[in-house]
């Protein structure tokens, strides 16, 4: 597990492209047979990819977190973006087809990840945050989610928002997690943009062709910067930063949030004329 530290917005003004990518971009999440995680000190979110092939995989971070087992003091959200598989929680097995999700409550001792077909492995994207209470584990089938349709082709942002770990679906301590799918011909997400000083966010961009690139904009509204991402890369967005993007083709992204509240629409909107 890699550790990333928090940054003051004034510091980011001096960053080169290389420094910006080193601090906020995570490039290698899904590697066959591996668990690749990043621990950001921004609200202590842990996120990353678990890609089992022939062997099951689990997350062992007891020494790094100073606990007896990974979810002793944490909750966990999982969305599978790869082939079919199963997740086993303390002996109970959950089938995970592509884009299925799972909320795992604090106190779950054993979490095992499995792929049905090693040649088409499951790709489990995870978000984990500190938790103070145990809420029930909930399996979230994408077929059972009623997406929010928003945007418009005229503004290149027609999309559907699927809420997974969200008060409309299940209870959680502070974690929120969902998936946004852009329609063909649409490329903009979260524009007009916003910040939310009360919560941080992590974006995972995926379902992109090999030569498709996403342009993720971040920074204070009057001091914006950008990162260029390829398929299955993620970016850390501190609470003071905007988080919006466009791409050379349509794409899908997973958003994960944590912080002071779980109010999805608690945001500070930024007027277009305020962007620099």
Regions inferred by a protein language model and the residue ranges of each:
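Conserved metal-binding segment of the jelly-roll/cupin
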Residues: 96-116, 228-249, 256-258
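A short beta-strand-loop-beta hairpin characteristic of the jelly-roll/cupin
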Residues: 70-98, 206-231
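Acidic, low-complexity central loop/insert segments
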Residues: 82-121, 125-130
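Double-stranded beta-helix
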Residues: 118-178, 183, 202-227, 254-276
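A short glycine-rich, His/Asp/Glu-containing loop-to-beta-strand
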Residues: 32-65, 158-201
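Hydrophobic, proline/glycine-rich low-complexity stretches
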Residues: 1-62, 66-71, 75-76, 275
């Amino acid at each position: 597990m890699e550790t990333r530290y928090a940054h003051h917005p004034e510091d980011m003004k001096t960053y080169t492209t290389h420094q910006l990518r080193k601090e906020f971009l995570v490039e290698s999440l899904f590697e066959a047979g591996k668990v690749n995680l990043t621990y950001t000190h921004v609200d202590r979110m842990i996120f990353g990819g678990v890609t089992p092939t022939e062997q099951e995989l689990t997350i062992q971070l007891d020494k790094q977190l100073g606990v007896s087992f990974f979810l002793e003091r944490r909750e966990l959200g999982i969305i599978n973006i790869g082939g079919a598989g199963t997740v086993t929680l303390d002996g109970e097995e959950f089938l995970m087809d592509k884009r299925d999700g799972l909320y795992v409550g604090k106190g779950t001792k054993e979490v095992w990840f499995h792929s049905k077909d090693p040649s088409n492995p499951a790709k489990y994207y995870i978000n984990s945050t500190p938790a103070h209470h145990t809420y029930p584990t909930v399996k979230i089938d994408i077929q059972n989610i009623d997406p929010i349709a928003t945007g418009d082709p005229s503004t290149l942002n027609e999309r559907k928002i699927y809420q997974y770990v969200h008060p409309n679906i299940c209870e959680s301590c502070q974690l929120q997690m969902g998936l946004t799918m852009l329609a063909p011909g649409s490329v903009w997400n979260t524009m007009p943009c916003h910040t939310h000083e009360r919560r941080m966010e992590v974006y995972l961009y995926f379902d992109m062709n090999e030569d498709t690139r996403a342009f993720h904009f971040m920074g204070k509204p009057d001091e914006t910067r950008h990162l260029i991402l390829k398929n299955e890369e993620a970016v850390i967005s501190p609470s003071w930063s905007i988080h919006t993007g466009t791409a050379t083709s349509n794409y899908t992204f997973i958003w994960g949030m944590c912080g002071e509240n779980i109010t999805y629409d608690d945001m500070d909107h930024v007027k277009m004329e305020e962007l620099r």
